[in-house]
């Protein structure tokens, strides 16, 4: 299926945004795992619920 013009641009931007968000969640998960391993309370900005 071929998309053209603006819709293709929009699709590419959405994919890029999703990739960035996914990477951010992965970084956060790694940060939380390291915090748990270290036994520290960690940064309040990343506090668990």
Curated annotation (Swiss-Prot):
Biological process, per Gene Ontology: xylan catabolic process
Instruction: Please name the GO terms that the record assigns under molecular function.
Output: feruloyl esterase activity
Q: Is the Transmembrane keyword given for this protein?
A: no
**What does it catalyze?**
feruloyl-polysaccharide + H2O = ferulate + polysaccharide
Q: Where in the cell is it found?
A: Secreted
Q: Provide the protein name.
A: Feruloyl esterase A
Q: Which UniProt keywords apply?
A: Carbohydrate metabolism, Hydrolase, Polysaccharide degradation, Secreted, Serine esterase, Xylan degradation
Gene Ontology, cellular component aspect: extracellular region
Query: What is the recorded function of this protein according to its Swiss-Prot or TrEMBL entry?
Result: Involved in degradation of plant cell walls. Hydrolyzes the feruloyl-arabinose ester bond in arabinoxylans as well as the feruloyl-galactose and feruloyl-arabinose ester bonds in pectin. Active against methyl esters of sinapate (MSA), but not caffeate (MCA).
* Record carries keyword Hydrolase: yes
Q: What class of enzyme is it?
A: hydrolase
Q: Membrane spanning segments where?
A: none
Q: Record's family?
A: Belongs to the AB hydrolase superfamily. FaeA family.
Q: Which domain of life is it from?
A: Eukaryota
What is the E.C. number? 3.1.1.73
